[in-house]
């Protein structure tokens, strides 16, 4: 029987903020244990370092410029096949618990007459998943209304638990309380060391874990993929007790940045450094307050993994469940004078990836760390191959990871990885005077070099990953490296010319047409009927049916 897939995604979890990835102070024993049971990939890159675009690439198995949902709240167009579409065709259900950042193509839905409450319409509206529970986790509200107008399942849960008010997420889960009974909102990062005013078991991460356990206990009738998509450790940086006190400033690792990054800085890089987030995270006192909270959020996530894995083992599901654990992007946390994500340094574009396969084929790689060049879109290809035995390569642009997980090969057939970023909706594009069509960045990276191209007439960026693994010395303006830059531009050009839009017919069908002997009466390039067989010409010879033209 096909094994189930538990596809766990955290939001904004850095690749290097796990103890199994070498972090010096954070302890993540449960995720570490999963890594010891499976394969940990140390070179996994997302296809865009921002929530929405990254997730849409993961859910479609396609690059951002293929699916078009290039930033947050940009709709994924109707007709773009998703993970759920491929899996259901193979007989496997695809369920969501948590976050997707999916924006609905309302115009496309209306054009096709798809109702949101129909089965097909609901799936198209939710990145192809059937919904057990969806909550994107940001229930902010201000003078102009709510950031997200949808009804929050988490808020309804909190109300049932006795938390008061219209928006208990904002009042309790995202706020602490001081000695004067004043709210200390998580939106203001100076409050990051204050515990959220909520029972730990009622906070977002345990809530989603409980829903996952409930789902697994009930779904027994057919194989499933469950996308357990956690909201944390994404900002706001606030965590309930006791996690708010587990780490302090002494646990914060040294910042990765240099004064040289402030000199002759690439204009796009500089614009992001000079925005509010970059300036704030460049202050040491901010890092000393925020990062311990971020670590506390990760520790809570790890504890919930322990709870979830314990249930899987005790219920007998561990041996029947493939577990994949990853993130949608990272978090700069002040490295490179930046906050948030958005650009292509490792802190932002690389993510953790662990794959545990209980089958005997994976016994030879348990505990292995693979440095193969991996892209997040490889997950969809892997899931589809697991369910159906083959990957529709004319649609999916990723590569199956099972040959590595099963010890059949060390590397994928890939020379480089690609990531894209569209910053046209951000203020930085306006400050740079860049038109929306040109506010785009492209990354090409292998194990030695990382290259960034910026549309709009800017110079490239280049980093020597062997000599400069922290990416502190931009070589993009150094003529001594022009040959490397030329190679990277050749790669970018080759990638840009890929066949990405011919998704309704595969190469096998095309090749059959090339050699087809089917004769349906289309005769081209023939001067005389004697040049072809009687079988082909006989339909167009012989006595005429009658005379109707007066000209004959």
Regions found by a protein language model. Give the residues of each.
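A contiguous, mid-protein "functional segment" used to position or interact
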Residues: 479-522
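Short, acidic/hydrophobic/Gly-rich beta-strand patch recurrent on exposed beta strands
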Residues: 464
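Formylglycine-dependent sulfatase
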Residues: 1-452, 460, 469-490, 522-552
């Amino acid at each position: 029987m096909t094994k189930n897939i538990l596809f766990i995604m955290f939001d904004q979890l850095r690749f290097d903020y796990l103890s199994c990835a070498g972090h010096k102070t954070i302890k993540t024993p449960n995720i570490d244990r999963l890594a010891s049971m499976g394969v940990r990939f140390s070179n996994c890159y997302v296809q865009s370092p921002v929530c929405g675009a990254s997730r849409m690439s993961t859910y479609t198995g396609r690059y951002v410029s293929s699916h078009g949902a290039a930033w947050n709240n940009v709709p994924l167009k109707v007709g773009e096949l998703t993970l759920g579409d491929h899996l259901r065709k193979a007989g496997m259900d695809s369920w969501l618990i948590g976050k997707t950042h999916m924006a609905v193509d309302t115009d496309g839905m209306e054009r096709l007459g798809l109702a949101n409450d129909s089965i097909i319409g609901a799936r198209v509206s939710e990145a192809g998943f059937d919904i057990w529970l969806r909550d994107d986790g940001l229930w902010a509200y201000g003078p102009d209304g709510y950031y997200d107008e949808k009804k929050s399942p988490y808020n309804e849960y909190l109300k049932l638990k006795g938390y008061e008010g219209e928006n208990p997420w904002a009042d309790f889960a995202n706020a602490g309380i001081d000695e004067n009974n004043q709210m200390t909102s998580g939106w203001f990062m100076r409050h990051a060391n204050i515990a959220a005013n909520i029972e730990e078991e009622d906070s977002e991460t345990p809530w989603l874990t409980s829903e996952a356990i409930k789902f697994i206990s009930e779904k027994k009738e057919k194989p499933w993929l469950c996308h357990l998509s956690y909201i944390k450790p994404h900002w706001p940086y606030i965590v309930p007790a006791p996690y708010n006190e587990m780490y302090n400033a002494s646990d914060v690792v040294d910042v990765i940045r240099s004064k040289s990054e402030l000199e002759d800085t690439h204009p796009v890089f500089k614009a992001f450094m000079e925005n509010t987030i970059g300036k704030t995270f460049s202050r040491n006192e901010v890092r000393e307050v925020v990062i311990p909270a971020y670590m506390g959020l990760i520790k809570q996530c790890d504890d919930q993994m322990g709870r979830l894995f314990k249930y899987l083992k005790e219920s007998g599901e561990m041996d029947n469940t493939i577990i994949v654990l990853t993130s949608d992007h990272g978090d700069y946390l002040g490295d490179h004078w930046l906050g948030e994500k958005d650009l292509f340094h490792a802190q932002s574009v690389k993510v953790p990836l662990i794959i545990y396969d209980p089958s005997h084929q994976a016994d030879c790689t348990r505990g292995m760390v693979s440095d193969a060049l991996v892209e997040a879109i490889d997950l969809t290809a892997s899931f589809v191959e697991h369910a159906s035995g083959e990957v529709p390569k004319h649609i999916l642009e990723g590569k199956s990871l099972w040959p590595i997980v099963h010890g059949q090969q060390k590397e994928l057939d890939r020379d480089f990885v690609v990531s894209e970023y569209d910053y046209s909706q951000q203020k930085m594009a306006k400050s740079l005077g860049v038109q929306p069509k040109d506010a785009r960045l492209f990354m090409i990276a292998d194990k030695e070099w990382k290259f960034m191209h910026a549309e709009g007439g800017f110079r490239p960026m280049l980093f020597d990953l062997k000599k400069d693994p922290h990416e502190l010395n931009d070589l993009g303006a150094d003529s001594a490296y022009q040959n490397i830059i030329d190679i990277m531009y050749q790669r970018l050009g080759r990638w840009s010319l890929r066949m990405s839009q011919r998704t309704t017919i595969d190469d096998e069908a095309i090749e059959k047409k090339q050699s087809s002997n089917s004769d349906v009466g289309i005769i081209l390039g023939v001067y005389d009927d004697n040049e072809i067989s009687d079988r082909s010409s006989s339909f167009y010879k012989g006595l005429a049916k009658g005379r109707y033209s007066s000209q004959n």
